[in-house]
């Protein structure tokens, strides 16, 4: 009764007999273990998964069934007492589960699916290759074609409802079996070494397209199914034709099969993550989708992206859900992790072939043969002698080259095959500095002779180790990679993001609001604003910006209000070049918008053409208190804050990472529910806190920084890496400036912003503070405005009247 759930036959015994579907494949002999590391008929794998399952007892079977879900807990005792050997799983069916006492239909269905998948890995998985899978899909297409044709004939004669139901069930069973075989076939094409070959990529796309169209025509009402019967037959023929291309392909890659291998991961401490990403391709099959570089998983050379996990520390995880597998890996406080994986197909190890034997020697060589079958011409022009190095000199060169190779460092990951091809090496930096006369790392064999085209063809193709799969999943993925950011950015990337390097487009898109009457004509509902981020009043104002003459491309500073951005900076989403700015909203818009509950004031222009500054009294209002009333906002934007333990205990069903509006005002960090709130829900004094960009928090969030204000720790997550860098940089700078100021007034943010034009001059600026005090001191006038005096910073400073 479960033949239509996963594409397997009704019983596991019929599953073994179903292998006769692809008995027409005669190109691969039973003794040729193509997926093994050696092409030998006498090769025996080191680990047999089928033998391991056959030796199971009742306790091992109950432990495996326990991982299928919590709904299996009431039946564990029944399974342990009645199924006492792993061999009994091959004869397990729905009736035997009923006799045991498992009355729930859902529990029997889950157990039967897991057992069928387990037997598949025990028997069929070791013999699979791409040609065999393509033949199975082709055979299933012919079966669908024959079943649909007979169903269309029987529909004309069927009178009773039960007869029509039997016809529909036969068609559904045939299509579902085809879908299951196609799923495995596409899963193979998504992994190396097939994901980089254009021929296999084209076949993969065509097969997926045909299968999706076929399923759309089948998943219809019963009356419409027979109307589209001719289309189903046509698409089945096209799908079979695409699979025939793989069967007739002369590439030896289609004969390579997977094999089972054990891997052991080690780490120095519990704080180090394993560096694995695990995804479920379909229920019960767990695949390593990504391996982080430098992690314990990367150090182990026996696992790659695309390998399927069968056992974790002696426990079989085939058929489990992804959550149980994640708990099995993440909850282990051990320094070693043992995995049994089904490796992806790889290149076999071929015997080394001597290239010197196939190369002809020069006639004048001393090692050449002393006789010749050609006619001797005493007056012919003889070939000049070639001077060779002595054996002593060659041996010295070989020893020197081997010494350099031993001290050199490996450039790429080791290849997945054990072939005769050498891996790339690079010289040590220190050794290169010492040996100035020899800059290239060359091989003595390549110096003596060159490799021709025929010898190039003898070199086997290498399938390099991969850390990521070609098709990343769109759904549920559990990550074991730690949240550490990469701060190294190339100079070219930074220069491309600067506002004055962006070319203005010639054509612009024009956006107009549609009238209500036109919406009625188009029969469209009136739009409603449901996003809380855009309910605040929206107003945009551009102020002129100033950049000192002679500064570099990175040293431009802006005298605009912290809530306002220059026109050029709003053309991109980057605020790196601006000393202070507003982070863009996390919505889909890429414009740097400004939303404030208060209207914008007017700017006052000084008498000098190079001096522009906003009036602090006319700046947009914001919730303030007595402690930071005179401080100007330095930075603000949307972030996510992780709730504290007390907040999570108060309400269990809550969002752990709510989105908040955060504002940096002086050395105070103000947290609001949104930008329209008048009072902050939390205020953090950065002088008494510790700002850290490294955290041991286990979460899938990225771009995390931590603020420790005893006795609490606050974790924040930014939406982009650029926001993370801006927040951490400006908070640390504000903390350093106000901490060194000591007894100076707190209203010095206006003068601080003037010296933030160049981030490279921060060390110089902070050094002047400790030596002779601040170079610029604020002065408060009677009208409340803040002015500053130039302290001799050259072109980087400015005067304000």
UniProtKB/Swiss-Prot annotation:
All copies of domain CRIC, residue ranges: 129-225
Pfam families linked: CRIC_ras_sig, PDZ, PH, SAM_1
UniProt membrane topology term: Peripheral membrane protein
Disruption outcome: No apparent phenotype. Double mutant cnk-1 and lin-45 and double mutant cnk-1 and ksr-1 show high lethality in the first larval stage, filling with fluid and with a rod-like appearance due to loss of the excretory duct. Double mutant cnk-1 and lin-45 also shows P12 to P11 cell fate transformations.
Limits of the PDZ domain: 262-344
GO annotation, cellular component aspect: cytoplasm; membrane
SAM domain sequence ranges: 56-121
UniProt xrefs under InterPro entries: CNKSR, CRIC_domain, PDZ, PDZ_sf, PH-like_dom_sf, PH_domain, SAM, SAM/pointed_sf
Keyword list, A-Z: Cytoplasm, Membrane
Membership in a protein family: Belongs to the CNKSR family.
Protein name per the record: Connector enhancer of kinase suppressor of ras
Gene source species: Caenorhabditis elegans
């Amino acid at each position: 009764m479960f033949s239509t759930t996963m594409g397997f036959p009704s019983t596991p015994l019929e599953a073994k007999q179903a292998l006769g579907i692809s008995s027409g494949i005669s190109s691969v002999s039973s003794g040729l273990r193509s997926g093994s590391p050696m092409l030998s008929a006498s090769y025996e794998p080191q680990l047999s998964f089928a033998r391991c399952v056959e030796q199971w007892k009742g306790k091992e079977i109950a432990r495996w069934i326990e991982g299928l879900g919590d709904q299996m807990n009431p039946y564990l005792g029944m399974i342990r007492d009645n199924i006492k050997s792993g061999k009994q799983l091959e004869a397990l069916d729905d009736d035997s589960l009923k006799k045991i006492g498992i009355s729930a239909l859902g529990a029997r269905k889950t157990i039967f699916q897991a057992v069928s998948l387990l037997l598949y890995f025990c028997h069929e998985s070791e013999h699979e290759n791409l040609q065999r899978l393509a033949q199975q899909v082709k055979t299933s297409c012919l079966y669908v074609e024959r079943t649909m044709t007979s169903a269309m004939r029987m529909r004309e004669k069927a009178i009773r409802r039960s007869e029509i139901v039997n016809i529909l069930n036969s068609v559904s069973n045939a299509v579902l079996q085809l879908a299951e075989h196609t799923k495995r076939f596409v899963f193979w094409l998504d992994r190396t070494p097939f994901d980089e070959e254009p021929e296999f990529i084209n076949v993969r796309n065509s097969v997926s397209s045909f299968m999706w169209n076929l399923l759309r025509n089948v998943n219809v009402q019963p009356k419409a199914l027979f109307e589209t019967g001719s289309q189903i037959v046509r698409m089945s023929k096209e799908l079979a034709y695409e699979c025939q291309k793989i069967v007739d392909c002369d590439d030896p890659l289609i004969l390579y099969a997977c094999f089972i291998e054990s891997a052991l991961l080690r780490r120095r401490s519990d704080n180090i993550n394993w560096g694995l990403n695990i995804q479920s391709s379909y229920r019960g099959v767990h695949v390593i989708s990504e391996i982080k570089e430098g992690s314990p998983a990367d150090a182990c050379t026996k696992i790659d992206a695309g390998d399927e996990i069968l056992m974790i520390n002696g426990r079989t995880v085939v058929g489990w859900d992804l959550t149980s597998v994640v708990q099995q890996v993440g909850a282990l406080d051990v320094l070693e992790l043992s995995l049994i994986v089904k490796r992806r197909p790889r290149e076999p190890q071929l015997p080394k072939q001597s290239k010197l034997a196939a190369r002809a020697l020069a006639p004048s060589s001393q090692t050449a043969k002393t006789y010749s079958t050609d006619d001797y011409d005493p007056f012919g022009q003889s070939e000049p002698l070639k001077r060779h190095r002595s054996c002593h000199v060659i041996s010295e060169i070989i020893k020197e080259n081997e010494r350099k190779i031993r001290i050199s460092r490996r450039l790429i990951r080791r290849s997945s095959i054990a072939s005769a091809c050498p891996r790339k090496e690079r010289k040590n930096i220190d050794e290169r500095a010492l040996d100035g006369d020899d800059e290239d790392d060359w091989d003595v064999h390549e110096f003596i002779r060159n490799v021709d085209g025929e010898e190039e063809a003898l070199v086997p193709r290498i399938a390099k180790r991969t850390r990521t799969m070609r098709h990343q999943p769109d759904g549920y993925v559990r990550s074991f990679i730690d949240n550490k950011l990469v701060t190294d950015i190339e100079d070219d990337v930074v220069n491309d993001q600067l506002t004055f390097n962006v070319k203005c487009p010639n054509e612009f898109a024009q956006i107009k609001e549609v009238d209500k009457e036109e919406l009625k004509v188009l029969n469209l509902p009136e739009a409603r604003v449901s996003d809380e981020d855009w309910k605040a009043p929206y107003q945009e104002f551009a102020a002129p910006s100033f950049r000192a003459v002679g500064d570099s491309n990175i040293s431009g500073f802006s005298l605009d209000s912290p809530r306002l951005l220059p026109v050029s900076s709003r053309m991109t989403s980057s605020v790196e070049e601006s000393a202070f700015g507003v982070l863009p909203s996390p919505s889909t818009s890429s414009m740097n918008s400004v939303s404030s509950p208060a209207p914008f004031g007017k700017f006052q222009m000084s008498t000098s053409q190079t001096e522009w500054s906003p009036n602090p009294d006319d700046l947009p209002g914001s919730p303030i208190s007595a402690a930071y009333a005179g401080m100007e906002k330095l930075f603000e934007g949307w972030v996510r804050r992780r709730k504290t333990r007390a907040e999570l205990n108060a309400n269990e069903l809550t969002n752990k990472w709510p989105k908040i509006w955060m504002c940096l005002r002086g050395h105070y960090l103000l947290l609001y529910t949104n930008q329209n709130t008048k009072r902050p829900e939390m205020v953090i004094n950065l002088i008494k806190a510790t700002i850290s960009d490294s955290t041991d928090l286990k979460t899938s969030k990225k771009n995390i920084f931590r603020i420790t204000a005893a006795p609490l720790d606050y974790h924040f997550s930014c939406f982009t890496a650029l926001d993370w860098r801006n927040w951490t940089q400006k908070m640390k700078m504000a903390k350093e400036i106000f901490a060194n100021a000591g007894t100076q007034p707190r209203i010095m943010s206006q003068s601080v912003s003037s010296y933030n034009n160049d981030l490279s001059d921060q060390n110089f600026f902070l050094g002047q503070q400790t030596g002779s005090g601040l170079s610029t001191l604020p002065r408060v006038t009677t009208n409340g405005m803040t002015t500053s005096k130039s302290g001799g910073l050259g072109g980087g400073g400015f005067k304000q009247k």
